[in-house]
């Protein structure tokens, strides 16, 4: 559990660093691709933080079972995959209103948390004694597919990225 938690914290720090780097370098970008990904990692990292705190042994969310961290993990991965896909639309244009993306990400984050914690409408991902649910398994395939699809515009428009980014 300690190793897993350390790896989770490391990934959260990396997500925060990606956001900080992209945000502070935004005026130097010729397009909005990296900035969009950077902003999305702020939200992905926050969900990952809540995911890490949601483990049973942490005691932060009493009354929840092992489904909660699994739901949060899937929510973060969906957000991450969809952000990589959406970012490809900014390969040939600047992101002129990054605060709008921040506001949109905040709304998405709030809706995700409401669906998991308050409305409890987010599909179950893990059932104690049974294991992973079909939704969680299908989600992993769907997430992988979206990430693969996101590679296509990147390879077609790789000239839109700075040569050092392509290395």
Q: What are the language-model segments listed below?
A:
Residues 52, 70, 88, 106, ...:
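Residue-identity detector for threonine
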Residues 77, 81-99, 108-116:
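Long amphipathic alpha-helical segments that form oligomerization/scaffold cores
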Residues 15, 100, 125-128:
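Short amphipathic alpha-helical segments, especially helix-boundary/capping motifs
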């Amino acid at each position: 559990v300690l190793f897993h938690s350390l790896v989770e914290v490391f990934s959260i720090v990396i997500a925060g660093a990606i956001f900080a780097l992209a945000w502070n370098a935004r005026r130097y970008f010729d397009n909005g691709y990296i900035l969009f990904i950077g902003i999305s990692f702020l939200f992905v990292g926050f969900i990952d933080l809540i995911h890490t705190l949601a483990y049973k042994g942490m005691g932060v969310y009493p009354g929840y079972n092992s489904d909660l961290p699994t739901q949060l993990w899937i929510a973060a991965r969906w957000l991450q995959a969809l952000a990589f896909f959406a970012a490809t639309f900014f390969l040939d244009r600047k992101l002129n209103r990054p605060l709008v993306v921040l506001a949109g990400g905040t709304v998405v984050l709030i809706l995700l948390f409401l669906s998991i914690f308050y409305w409890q409408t987010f599909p179950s991902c893990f059932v104690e004694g049974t294991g992973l649910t079909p939704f969680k398994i299908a989600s992993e395939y769907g997430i992988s597919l979206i990430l693969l699809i996101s590679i296509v515009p990147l390879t077609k428009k790789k000239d839109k990225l700075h040569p050092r980014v392509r290395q």
